[in-house]
Amino acid sequence: MNHATTRAAILPEIIKLIQAQYGLSEDEALHAFYTSAPGASFADDETGLYGQSPNYIFGLFLQEQREREPQ
């Protein structure tokens, strides 16, 4: 399976997790993910992040969001 196919297979799971966590539409969740550091890394073949599980990638996304929240 090539990298694009792997990403296409797991992206819907990541987006569903984001939607459930934040109550976002699919488009909003896609935007939130791809404008995050994990989203940028997921799209980059060099990082290998596309080979990780949806839950792991979602965890990275959550961690970044929590770090962005004002204290």
Please place each PLM-identified region on the residue numbering.
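C-terminal alpha-helical interaction appendages
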Residues: 1-71
